[in-house]
UniProtKB/Swiss-Prot annotation:
Primary gene name: CCT8
Crosslink (Glycyl lysine isopeptide (Lys-Gly) (interchain with G-Cter in SUMO2)) position: 224, 254, 260, 534, 539
Modified residues (N-acetylalanine): 2
PANTHER family referenced in this protein's UniProt entry, alphabetically: CHAPERONIN
Localization (cell): Cytoplasm; Cytoplasm, Cytoskeleton, Microtubule organizing center, Centrosome; Cytoplasm, Cytoskeleton, Cilium basal body
Name used for this protein in its record: T-complex protein 1 subunit theta
Keywords, in A-Z order: Acetylation, ATP-binding, Cell projection, Chaperone, Cilium, Cytoplasm, Cytoskeleton, Hydrolase, Isopeptide bond, Magnesium, Metal-binding, Nucleotide-binding, Phosphoprotein, Ubl conjugation
Quaternary structure and interacting proteins, as annotated: Component of the chaperonin-containing T-complex (TRiC), a hexadecamer composed of two identical back-to-back stacked rings enclosing a protein folding chamber. Each ring is made up of eight different subunits: TCP1/CCT1, CCT2, CCT3, CCT4, CCT5, CCT6A/CCT6, CCT7, CCT8. Interacts with PACRG. Interacts with DNAAF4. Interacts with synaptic plasticity regulator PANTS.
Source species: Macaca fascicularis
Length: 548
């Protein structure tokens, strides 16, 4: 009989064998802060237009080369629970605003780094948290006073493109003017009168070859597909959409047929042919000249479609089918029945075209009032086009934010330095120990212009001292000049480097909430990981290809 070994007294004896627990400042708080600092340091070098790219290979061995913090974090699959909280805050920023994810990480990391200094000199966690929350509220009070301009007309392509430039610059520095114009054209063309803009209505089609300057905007949809039949171009298209295969109905039972004469053999499939002919003719008689199907196309059905001059397009993706229905105003039919007028879609032209060496089917609306617009991106490599697509995504999300709130604040670290200056002054007036935390909160804002300066290769301390000097004189819109070879500053409003008010508001709020949540943790209790055999490493999950 095995000897019973008693567990050590204390918290551990209440837990299952193999469970771990950490408590106190040294074991829990400082450990969590260290993990968050490491994560923030990773993405900090990717901040701003001159940020470095990260090469990430995910669990499916897919390669990502990008400086987009949201993509990096999504593919890294962070496991540490405290670092995960900051990752979740950045995901919330992406859902709420669509841009500014790296700001959340860098700012939250700076807040925690400075909180550690305060804790080590003797402040309690509750005093640091209270100071941070007071400072966050103060920052939100100050922020409306820093608004330098507002978007006047969101239906003017030139004005919109100038406002989108900054968000694209951080991903595609050098191509921002061209891309901003493309995105502005796409967004303005489908911006409804109601003012409710849906980002899913801007589609991106990536076609390998040529260069980024060959990219274009189409009002309608583009699919990397070929037509099934002989008809490759239709003007004034009336479109019937089917979610079923374009084929005759067959019984599920199997049967054996005895054929005795040559005449019986000749007439054997004639009934099936006549039925298929009648079905396709009925569709053609409704006026439909384009059929889009979500299933396979039978050879016999294809023959009759060619006979009645019907253009056939097959889309394998049900999402593409839904988007096409939305674009052309059609209803997807589950059975091969003739569509009524209300179920048919319409667009100005459907044609098979060649972009580079890729065949594409284009559903085009000549008038700029279509429900969906497509940006056709060209590029030399897939990774480059993926990165351009992320820049387009940021630009479209910025337009969406501007439809909700047209206010803009100066970029380039100008807003952060002004907030730091004013919150520091406010901290001086606070009597309690919270004033130290309030001042550290203000100091954390310096992390943003510091990251911009370091990534641009100039001395950060010189830049920050110059910014403070200019802001003390009352120039609220002056920020870092990233194009200068020496530490220099310039007016961000004149340079057109502007951030959305909502983006800044939510980034400060979410970063502070994440930092405070991490600081509130004083114990970590981890159950023993579940046992059992590990899944074989060579085989992938059946649904892994969907995540790719």
């Amino acid at each position: 009989m095995a000897l019973h070994v008693p567990k050590a007294p204390g918290f551990a004896q209440m837990l299952k064998e193999g469970a771990k627990h950490f408590s106190g400042l040294e074991e829990a708080v400082y450990r969590n802060i260290q993990a968050c600092k490491e994560l923030a340091q990773t993405t900090r070098t990717a901040y701003g237009p001159n940020g470095m790219n990260k090469m990430v290979i995910n669990h499916l061995e897919k390669l990502f080369v990008t400086n987009d913090a949201a993509t990096i974090l999504r593919e890294l699959e962070v496991q540490h629970p405290a670092a995960k909280m900051i990752v979740m805050a950045s995901h919330m920023q992406e859902q709420e605003v669509g841009d500014g994810t790296n700001f959340v990480l860098v700012f939250a990391g700076a807040l925690l780094e400075l909180a550690e200094e305060l804790l080590r000199i003797g402040l309690s966690v509750s005093e640091v948290i209270e100071g941070y929350e007071i400072a966050c509220r103060k920052a939100h009070e100050i922020l409306p006073n820093l608004v330098c301009c507002s978007a006047k007309n969101l239906r003017d392509v030139d004005e919109v493109s100038s406002l989108l430039r900054t968000s694209i610059m951080s991903k595609q520095y050098g191509n921002e003017v061209f891309l901003a114009k493309l995105i502005a054209q796409a967004c303005v063309s489908i911006f409804p009168d109601s003012g409710h803009f849906n980002v899913d209505n801007i589609r991106v089609c990536k076609i390998l070859g040529s260069g980024i300057s060959s990219s274009s905007v189409l009002h309608g949809m583009v699919f990397k597909k070929e037509t099934e039949g002989d008809v490759t171009s239709v003007k004034d298209a009336k479109i019937a959409v089917y979610s079923c295969p374009f084929d005759g109905t067959i019984t599920e039972t199997k049967g054996t047929v005895l054929i005795k004469t040559a005449e019986e053999l000749m007439n054997f499939s004639k009934g099936e042919e006549n039925l298929m002919d009648a079905q396709v003719k009925a569709i053609a008689d409704t006026g439909a000249n384009v059929v889009v199907t979500g299933g396979k196309v039978a050879d016999m059905a294809l023959h009759y479609a060619n006979k009645y001059n019907i253009m056939l397009v097959r889309l394998n993706s049900k999402w593409d089918l839904r988007r096409l229905c939305k674009t052309v105003g059609a209803t997807a039919l589950p059975r091969l029945t003739p569509p009524v007028l209300e179920e048919m879609g319409h667009c100005d032209s459907v044609c098979l075209s060649e972009v580079g060496d890729t065949q594409v089917v284009v559903f085009k609306h000549e008038k700029e009032d279509g429900a969906i617009s497509t940006i056709v991106l060209r590029g030399s490599t897939d990774n480059l086009m993926d990165d351009i697509e992320r820049a387009v995504d940021d630009g479209v999300n910025t337009f969406k934010v501007l439809t909700r709130d047209k206010r803009l604040v100066p970029g380039g670290g100008a807003t952060e330095i002004e907030l730091a200056k004013q919150i520091t002054s406010y901290g001086e007036t606070c009597p309690g120990l919270e004033q130290y935390a309030i001042k550290k909160f203000a100091e954390a804002f310096e992390a943003i212009p510091r990251a911009l300066a370091e990534n641009s290769g100039v001395k950060a301390n010189e830049v920050i001292s110059k910014l403070y000097a200019v802001h003390q004189e009352g120039n609220k819109n002056v920020g870092l000049d990233i194009e200068a070879e020496v530490p220099a500053v310039k007016d961000m409003l004149e340079a057109g480097i502007l951030d959305t008010y909502l983006g800044k508001y939510w980034a400060i709020k979410l970063a502070t909430n994440a930092a405070v949540t991490v600081l509130r943790v004083d114990q970590i209790i981890m159950a023993k990981p579940a046992g059992g055999p590990k899944p074989p490493s060579g085989k992938k999950d059946w649904d892994d290809d969907q995540n790719d």
